[in-house]
Amino acid sequence: MNKDMLLLGIGGAGTIMTRGVLRAFGSPINAHAADTDAASGAPGDIPFTLIGGSRLAGRGSGGQPAAARAAFDDDPAVLDPAFDGIRTCVVLTALGGGTGGGATSGILKRLHAHGISTLLFATLPFSFEGHDRERSAKAEAAPLAREADVSVFLPLDELVSEAGTDNMSDALRQAHDTVASGVTLLWRLLKKPGYIRLDPERLHAAIIGAGRARFAAAAATGENRVEEALAKLAASPLLARTSGSAPVRTILVGILAGDDLRLSEVATVASGLSAAFGPDAKLELGTVNDEQTFSGRLALVVLLFEESPAVATRPARSGERALASQSRFGDTSKTTWEGEDLDVPTYLRRNLTLER
């Protein structure tokens, strides 16, 4: 098992989603989970680190981000053994209170101190959970958007809208499964590449300092499977541009199919995504040819990297202080326009709901 990439689940929901990826992938993944609640690691099916054991005694943070933050700050090196040899870390977490909201920022900083690039997927609470949870999630999202190389924020309201059920437990499970299935496709693309290779090193280079992104996946079968999968992506609110979105700078797409994948299908995907989401955007494309998993089926996984109006100042990674991006942007001051701080994402500044 190649260990240059790490899948890291933070908090209870992050751990659940990480387990979902492990189940869907079907073969060993370099994964780890961390939580203030010892019960999250009780199944013993995934390497687990307890955060703040001396402070919280494994009882969890009680939904208090400040408690989780303090617990991680007590011992910020607690996860360091899991970071050894890692180049890129995919982080799964949930915002709106608790360990995910409180500890993720500190963990991202620690990852960057180790020279590790980070791709963050964070769910946002249901709207019915109230203004306190919503305000907490927004306050937590701002530093995460600065600390992560790429941040993808996924509102549970919108994930559930694709689940097609009104049952509470089923909807939440399917929302987590939606995130897990998309991340699984991304992982499979990077770890089991086909004729057009999109390997972890290309992802590492693509995400460094990239900023915000949109993310979705779709699958279809039959004679018109490419057109159907593209139509699903075009209709997905996860990829829709809103008033809080910036133009797309880079389209990263994976095409996963069996041995029947055709060159014409690859060309249709490339042209269709460019036309729909960014005709001037750079296209990074990779394929997976896996007859056992995708026989007769075609799946697409897409990351849309948005243009960044400003680059937040962040300590340089170990060994990367000479990068041109650091020297160009390291000393920039706050960008303001009519009293608004443009370094803060628009959806946070203007209290907008993230839409897919």
Summary of predicted features, one role per range:
Residues M1-R356:
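Tubulin/FtsZ superfamily GTPase core signature
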